[in-house]
Amino acid sequence: MTAKYSLLYVDPPWSYGNTISNGAAADHYSTMKLIDIKRLPVWELAAENSVLAMWYTGTHNQEAIELAEAWGFTVRTMKGFTWVKLNQNAELRINKALTEGEVTDFYDFLDLLNAETRMNGGNHTRANTEDLLIATRGTGLERKHAGIKQVVYSPLGAHSEKPWEVRHRLELLYGDVPRIELFSRSEAPGWHHWGNQCATAAVELLPGCAIDVVKTEAA
């Protein structure tokens, strides 16, 4: 494996312990057991000094730490970014309320915003956020922008699709470094990609084996 990436942006296909959550995820993409995700040799993709930015859900805090460590990273913060999930039509309804004068003060606006956050499952409170941890290998990466904020408000896209804004903020945070998105679904300028739903993969990533696709095809 010749390609080494300084920034690895990952959205693992977590498997859930209950039938409802696991079934909902599996309806849209293939989930994987933790042990199988750990066996993917992400450590072969990572540069000596690199950053892992990885999504996880509130039910998988410990699993996320274990996975980062299995890939050779040390978790620095569990809340690099927090995505506040808005309903898909939140923009239309909020704009309508503002236009029609339904919002008369700051607290009206807060009530409206809270009403438009997604209501997911939960055994205690109902979940409406998802977090991205940041972990480092070696010395990590130098922060290029000191004004990048943690919280991202963004409507839901397709099932489990993450906001483009987070990828953009990572670019601002760490600069123009070699970067790859794993378990990717769509391409983005300046990024390499790997995943069974992306059109073109930069690498072939199998348990115990990472292969540069371009090098393989040229051989």
Describe each region flagged by the PLM:
Residues 1-219:
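Class I S-adenosyl-L-methionine-dependent methyltransferase catalytic core
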